[in-house]
Amino acid sequence: IRRLRTRLGIPPERLQVICTSASFKDADYAVEFGAQLSGKDPTDFRKVQGDLLERPGAAKGTAADAAALDAFDLNDFYEAASDADRLKVIEGFLKYRKVTAPWELQPSLYKALESFGPMSSLVNSTMKEAQPVDELGAKLFEADVPAEVAARAVTNLIALGSVARREPTEPGLLP
């Protein structure tokens, strides 16, 4: 950002910057980071802190949970031509989570995931600090889940969580 600002000839005082992240453990470092990133003076930044709202019911997923998430091909989900086709891809997972038909993609996924222990664990752990994706399987699923199954389950969980919404105008369940 600093180089772009310089190349465009924008003086620091004309640049407004909003940096957001829950992954900084030290708010003062966040100010320094924003200043370095933008080329602005650290005194131009104000830190705003809040409390994390953790999702209830966080728990490690079982082998059955991982298998249900691993049972569909994410490429098929993304390549589906319509929401109805996407629902066919994830039908088994929705049934596993006991979401009753008729289904609508976003709200049905929200119902399936809002109280799903691994989803709550994913949200809670990733909002505190950045997490290496390749370590999430061991954090989100019990030890008896094979690593490759857990990895695919995490990938599918992240994808579904970003689509899951109560209403189309709301953000996804996975922030």
PLM feature spans:
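Helicase motor interdomain insertion/brace
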Residues: 1-10, 14-16, 20-175
